[in-house]
Amino acid sequence: GSGKTTQLPKIAMMVGRGQKGLIGHTQPRRIAATSIAKRISEEMDAEVGQVAGYKIRFKDELEPGATIKLMTDGILLAETQRDRLLKAYDTIIIDEAHERSLNIDFLLGYLREILPKRPDLKLIITSATIDSERFAKHFESVNKKPVPSINVSGRLYPVQIRYRPVQDEEENDDRTLMQAIADACDELMGAGSGDILVFLPGEREIREA
């Protein structure tokens, strides 16, 4: 990717955001919010929660002096009930907006309505696939001002697809799956140095592998 998820909050800090409120950064899933907070903290040579922390359901890793707050979009949506103008934030980053969940759609609609009341609030919407011009026009209609749109190219790597021989359906049980993974890894390890990324259908299969 382009690095937008981990670099944008740090860039926002560099240009002076996060001084009058938190830099809020939403993710569709809890595991993404926690792992990104850890990654940003690592890059900034700090403990999780000191500069960048996270808040998810039942867990809050954010110290009083922190600047960047990772959270699920559901957490930010819940905060609108007690902080209707989101005054705790001076910058909000809505990441992965293309997922178009109910929470994200509600948030985008809500933020559009409060922006005229919060001219100091900066809203950043990021995605790998959304129609940026359409989103820009949607928010331009609020303040009657041009909304900047930035396209950043990601990195593409060559991919070679190879298939292992098809197995008999009668043999297609969990042990066969594990054996197929082991065989594929053996073949790849014999082809030279590199990393192996395995996709499996469920959590149980991942843990067993």
Which residue stretches match the model-derived regions?
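P-loop NTPase motor module signature
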Residues: 1-209
